[in-house]
Swiss-Prot record:
It comes from Raoultella ornithinolytica. This is Chaperonin GroEL. Keywords: ATP-binding, Chaperone, Cytoplasm, Isomerase, Nucleotide-binding. InterPro entries: Chaperonin_Cpn60_CS, Cpn60/GroEL, Cpn60/GroEL/TCP-1, GroEL-like_apical_dom_sf, GROEL-like_equatorial_sf, TCP-1-like_intermed_sf. GO terms for molecular function: ATP binding; ATP-dependent protein folding chaperone; isomerase activity. GO terms for biological process: protein refolding. One of its GO terms (cellular component) is cytoplasm. It catalyses: ATP + H2O + a folded polypeptide = ADP + phosphate + an unfolded polypeptide. Forms a cylinder of 14 subunits composed of two heptameric rings stacked back-to-back. Interacts with the co-chaperonin GroES. ATP binds at residues 30-33, 51, 87-91, 415, 479-481, 495. The keyword Isomerase applies.
């Protein structure tokens, strides 16, 4: 086992604070409307330019092991805030740095670290409750657009696009961000349910100009099996032909003789048919087929439940107003499924989302909810160069997370004002002893840090502005973009309550651990001499 380097007490804490400061100073220059860019070197390709706090934090590794431990712990704050609310990473880092710096000063002055931590925790619990009372629901498009604009670093077009997307696909709808092809940002909305499987044969195409299959009011056959024998399908095909409607077959696969016969029938105009593979794999495919069945009012023909394809009737088939199939995707528009059944299915999937353990599963389940409940919107980000595209895409992603958080828990006044008001409200808070009271003061003083940093990045004097804001009340604050004071809500400067709350909770959690650190252990660096000795046997 390698020899260890151990540091105790103040020696350890000073080193740790140095690491915290290096990381936090790099991250906090990005805060606010006048935040600066950070350029990150990449081992290949052009450097990345970003104003996203967590992207900066992730890049930082320090040479000194003890300093690096401090930096990595604050990196955890940014990552956790990002995972919980998708934004507020810089705010969380600034808060953590402020609490750690003030807390370690108090420890150096002889306060009991455990009592300090208890005081900080008490202040944060009270602050979270206070934030909830200040929170205003965020339901209209205007407020959603404002939240998106602030989070995308004051880019109004992004805010408007996100609000429009939420308008089209509902609060539950899936909104994805992709690379655009032009210079402008675009919004692409897919109504109905879309999945990424295309036609099994190009001979099904009936709209050559678009290279797609478009079927009006078709029957939809859902089969959880491979179909290769046409005899199994004859009864259904005959019934559909009599009804004079087209047929869409969604099965695990349609191959060989069965596919050839369907193609011949289509080309001769006997019955309009199109076949596609079912989306997903394994259990997920079964679940998605069931989703489509619920949406279209059909039944999945599955041998697991004793149903045979030969015995399927028109009653077992789903229906929709229109189905559009191209090379890679299938879209079912206006399925005739009962609203009650669809809502029941959505509720069932939501329950699974709550119980999901992996992010991947959760994401897939949320996509299924969106496809059943609303639709899918794609924001295509336009930019002149790839470097700009990456930077802009990261901002749009942040803005999207922020607006979702705002819809979930409401909004508070932005620009660091909400935390200043909370701190003022809790000024009279006391605990069991003097050291705990100091802990409360440390947390309350740190709550001013985001406002001060926003002002500092805008090139103004933080103390002057902070005092002016504290002299006001309610939503009165400082708009760093226009350098004027006024009502932050009227200025359209809003922060999602969830983002502010998460930032404060995670910052206090990690800061509390660091303040109560008494010893740090790391591997001793191997001496250069030992390295040279190891390489000595390599004669030329």
């Amino acid at each position: 086992m390698a020899a260890k380097d151990v540091k105790f007490g103040n020696d350890a804490r000073v080193k740790m604070l140095r690491g915290v400061n290096v990381l936090a100073d790099a991250v906090k220059v990005t805060l606010g409307p006048k935040g600066r860019n950070v350029v990150l070197d990449k081992s290949f390709g052009a450097p990345t330019i970003t104003k996203d706090g967590v992207s900066v934090a992730r890049e930082i590794e320090l040479e000194d092991k003890f300093e690096n431990m401090g930096a990595q712990m604050v990196k955890e704050v940014a990552s956790k805030a990002n995972d919980a609310a998708g934004d507020g990473t810089t705010t969380a880092t600034v808060l953590a740095q402020a609490i750690i710096a003030e807390g370690l000063k108090a420890v150096a002055a002889g306060m009991n670290p455990m009592d300090l931590k208890r005081g900080i925790d008490k202040a944060v619990v009270a602050a979270v409750e206070e934030l909830k009372t200040l929170s205003v629901p965020c339901s209209d498009s205007k407020a959603i657009a404002q939240v998106g604009t602030i989070s995308a670093n004051s880019d109004e077009t992004v805010g408007k696009l996100i609000a429009e997307a939420m308008d089209k696909v509902g609060k539950e709808g899936v909104i994805t961000v992709e690379d655009g092809t032009g210079l402008e940002d675009e919004l692409d909305v897919v109504e109905g349910m879309q999945f990424d499987r295309g036609y099994l044969s190009p001979y099904f195409i009936n709209k050559p100009e678009t290279g797609a299959v478009e079927l009006e009011s078709p029957f939809i056959l859902l089969a959880d099996k491979k179909v290769s024998n046409i005899r199994e399908m004859l009864p259904v095909l005959e019934a559909v032909a009599k009804a004079g409607k087209p047929l869409v077959i969604i099965a695990e696969d349609v191959e060989g003789e069965a596919l050839a016969t369907l193609v011949v029938n289509t080309m001769r105009g006997i019955v309009k048919v199109a076949a596609v593979k079912a989306p997903g794999f394994g259990d997920r495919r079964k679940a998605m087929l069931q989703d489509i069945a619920t949406l279209t009012g059909g039944t999945v023909i599955s041998e697991e439940i004793g149903m045979e394809l030969e015995k399927a009737t028109l009653e077992d088939l789903g229906q929709a107003k229109r189905v559009v199939i191209n090379k890679d995707t299938t879209t079912i528009i206006d399925g005739v499924g009962e609203e009650g059944a669809i809502q029941g299915r959505v509720a069932q999937i939501r329950k699974q989302i709550e119980e999901a353990t992996s992010d991947y599963d959760r994401e897939k389940l949320q996509e299924r909810v969106a496809k059943l409940a609303g639709g899918v919107a794609v924001i295509k980000v336009g930019a002149a160069t790839e470097v700009e595209m990456k930077e802009k895409k990261a901002r749009v992603d942040d803005a999207l997370h922020a607006t979702r958080a705002a819809v979930e828990e409401g909004v508070v006044a932005g620009g660091g004002v909400a935390l200043v008001r909370v701190a003022a409200k809790l000024a009279g808070l006391t605990a069991q002893n003097e050291d705990q009271n100091v802990g409360i003061k440390v947390a309350l003083r740190a709550m001013e840090a985001p406002l001060r940093q926003i002002v500092s990045n805008a090139g103004e004097e933080p103390s002057v502005v902070a005092n002016n804001v504290k002299a006001g009340e309610g939503n009165y604050g400082y708009n760093a973009a226009t350098e004027e004071y006024g009502n932050m809500i009227d200025f359209g400067i809003l922060d999602p309550t969830k983002v502010t709350r998460s930032a404060l909770q995670y910052a206090a959690s990690v800061a509390g651990l660091m303040i109560t650190t008494e010893c740090m252990v790391t591997d001793l660096p191997k001496s250069d001499a030992a390295d040279l000795g190891a390489a000595g046997g390599m004669g030329g």
